[in-house]
């Protein structure tokens, strides 16, 4: 019996040694250009980035806020595999001999006030709400150029219209004005955020009403100057957009599209500094807006007795005027939302709090916030 067991053990060892190595399955990032194999994403959500730079002496990859030194092979290709990443979209850059560049293997995105590379770590079925589906009617994303008297310049708005817009020609629609964050632009929500898929899917499921969504660059696509106040109404960053929004953008949208123009049919939401802008615009203009969404909203230093003309002192007025006030953020970010909600609680201002579990100050948080917000707005 001992000899038999020994033979079996040797045979098993031989089979094990002959078996192929179980390499983690890898897939190309969906944002790769057609000819690029890398970046690759493995089953542990790690990204492998590779670039040919035979004359470089030092190459690094900066992914999701972390810097990774890259290793050179004999052919002059540099590569690195990141730590496991949160599912969803991530900006990244390459640093080649101290020059920050984009990866030619991916499409480019406007983030950090410059062009950036991007990769998408696949989510499971729980991410189907931001994916396109063949059995769902799809709306359109339009780019609309208009002249702003306030800024004395030509500007561009990105506008989503629901699938039924061009066939239901007698119907008018409520409008959501949706702002991006600091260092991004009006394309962010449709590219990084995939808002058109979220809208299509939520409308098709009956969880959201058909609506028009308007996105504009908001004058926060340039870096914010250090040393200036971040507090509400004190910071000059992005303030130039406020008269554009109120005096030019809204009238242009109401003239160009079949909109409902009453305050109950107009909402504004934004992510990060776009949330700061949304609060700055909506609270002093409750005669024009009835819905407000702050997605990781950068609302700092709120003084309910002073800011927004003191409107927050009258809790009954605000709670009546705002049909829905949404505040959402991720569990892994420190944007100051707890301090904001504490201030609002003390003032008696009602709001609905949403938490994105396991996510930080990133696009997956804001995709989730948008999905949650639109299932309540205009309803």
Regions flagged by a language model, labelled:
Residues 2-10:
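Bacterial N-terminal signal peptides that target proteins for export
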Residues 23-25:
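Boundary at the C-terminal end of the N-terminal hydrophobic targeting segment
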Residues 18-20:
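N-terminal signal peptide c-region/cleavage motif recognized by signal peptidases
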Residues 10-11, 32:
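General helical structural elements
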Residues 27-29, 35, 41-67, 72-379:
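Non-catalytic cap/lid and distal C-terminal segments of serine-dependent acyl enzymes
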Residues 14-15:
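Short, linear, compositionally biased motifs with a strong N-terminal bias
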């Amino acid at each position: 019996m001992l000899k038999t067991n020994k033979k079996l053990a040797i045979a098993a060892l031989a089979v094990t040694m002959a078996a192929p190595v179980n390499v983690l399955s890898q897939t190309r990032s969906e944002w790769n250009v057609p000819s690029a194999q890398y970046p690759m994403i493995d089953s542990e959500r790690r990204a492998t980035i590779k670039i040919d730079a035979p004359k470089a002496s030092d190459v690094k990859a900066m992914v999701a806020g972390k810097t990774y030194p890259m290793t050179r092979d004999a052919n002059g290709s540099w590569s690195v595999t990141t730590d496991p990443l949160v599912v969803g979209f991530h900006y990244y850059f390459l640093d080649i001999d101290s020059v920050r560049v984009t990866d030619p293997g991916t499409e480019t995105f406007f983030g950090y006030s410059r062009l950036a590379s991007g990769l998408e770590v696949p989510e499971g079925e729980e991410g189907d709400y931001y994916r396109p589906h063949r059995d769902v009617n799809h709306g359109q994303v339009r780019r609309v150029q208009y002249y702003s008297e306030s800024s004395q310049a030509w500007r561009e708005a990105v506008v989503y219209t629901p699938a039924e817009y061009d066939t239901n020609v007698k119907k008018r629609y409520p409008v959501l004005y949706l702002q991006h964050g600091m260092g991004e632009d009006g394309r962010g929500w449709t590219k990084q955020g995939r808002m058109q898929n979220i809208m299509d899917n939520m409308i098709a499921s009956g969880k959201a009403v058909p609506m028009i969504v308007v996105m504009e660059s908001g004058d926060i696509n340039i870096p914010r100057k250090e040393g200036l106040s971040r507090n509400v109404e004190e910071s000059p960053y992005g303030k130039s957009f406020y008269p554009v929004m109120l005096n030019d953008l809204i009238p242009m949208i109401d003239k160009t599209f079949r909109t409902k123009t009453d305050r109950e049919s107009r909402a504004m939401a934004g992510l990060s500094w776009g949330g700061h802008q949304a609060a700055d615009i909506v609270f002093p203009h409750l005669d024009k807006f009835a819905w407000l969404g702050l997605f990781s909203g950068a609302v700092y230093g709120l003084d309910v007795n002073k800011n927004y003309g003191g409107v927050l002192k009258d809790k009954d007025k605000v709670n009546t005027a705002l049909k829905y006030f949404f505040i959402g953020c991720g569990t892994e970010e420190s944007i100051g939302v707890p301090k904001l909600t504490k201030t609002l609680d003390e003032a008696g201002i009602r709001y609905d709090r949403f938490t994105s579990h396991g996510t930080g100050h990133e696009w997956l948080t804001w995709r989730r916030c948008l999905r949650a917000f639109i299932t309540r707005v205009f309803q």
